Regions:
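Hydrophobic/aromatic-enriched cytosolic interaction surfaces used to assemble or bind macromolecules
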Residues: 1-259
Length: 259
């Protein structure tokens, strides 16, 4: 981590991450991986998202500068995806509400993911979206899932086997199945117990017809009780790999794949 020279802020990329668990932002130089800073900001859980966001923007000196690019990541479980060849812009709200009931003051946004060949739809609080647009008019807004999905799409082309990727967070398990770059499944489960995670992962493995001997299972994120999780999975699967945990959130780290 390094001190940013804000007189040269237009050479840097600002990435803001908004989650119910807390806010954070990263400033980095696209041509220098080591030239970055990462700052976290706590939220008051008795306040609304928009109220917390107003405080965050006002309290953060770094947001007063102009940047080469500004990215905003929204952490929300309300997301779904559509194969790009079936997607129509004018139907995005209708498609989204096939999967999630309508919610007051929600705006539906879309990320076109070229490497995964899907359109990812996600919901954002309407007032927060307006506030973000006012303060960061040129920002690109992503679901936190989007850069992770694109990163795995690239990695899945390596080798000649299918891959199940599991990204673990405190209360959430995000799963992605790829067949040499082609997305076969994307799903998320609210769970934090090791037994529940093992159940969902093995269920997906079976339902997708993956090979215990040939295909691969990759784990990333906050892997609590890692030894227990590995021991249970290794009873059934041969090729299990754990990705190194980065110093910053995995979705911010992989955001470069959406550049």
């Amino acid at each position: 981590m390094t001190v940013i020279d804000f007189s040269k802020s237009e050479q840097y990329t600002l990435s803001i991450r908004l989650s119910a668990d807390g806010f954070s932002f990263s400033i980095y130089h696209p041509q220098a991986d080591s030239d970055y800073t990462y700052i976290t900001y706590p939220v008051n859980k008795s306040y609304s998202l928009t109220a917390n966001l107003k405080e965050f923007i006002c309290a953060t000196e770094a947001f007063k500068y102009s940047y080469r690019k500004t990215n905003i990541l929204i952490d929300t479980p309300r997301f779904t995806f559509v194969p790009f060849e079936l997607f129509e812009d004018e139907c995005q709200d209708e498609i989204f509400h096939y999967n999630f009931p309508p919610k007051d003051n929600e705006t539906i946004l879309c990320n076109i993911l070229g490497k995964s060949n899907v359109a990812l739809l996600f919901g954002v609080n309407k007032h927060s979206h307006q506030l973000l647009h006012e303060h960061f008019p040129n920002a690109r807004i992503f679901s936190c899932v989007s850069p992770v999905l694109e990163h795995f799409a690239i990695k899945s082309k390596e080798g000649n086997c299918r891959k199940l990727y599991a990204h673990l967070r405190r209360d959430l398990l995000e799963t992605f199945v790829f067949d040499k770059g082609k997305l076969m499944l994307c799903n998320a489960f609210n769970c934090k117990k090791t037994a529940d995670r093992v159940y969902y992962l093995l269920y997906i493995w079976q339902q997708q017809g993956l090979s215990q001997d040939k295909d691969q299972h990759h784990l990333s994120g906050e892997i609590e009780n890692k030894e227990e999780l590995l021991a249970e999975l290794q009873k059934f699967l041969r090729n299990i790999f754990i990705m190194p945990k980065p110093n910053i959130p995995f979705d911010i780290q992989t955001l470069l794949t959406c550049e």
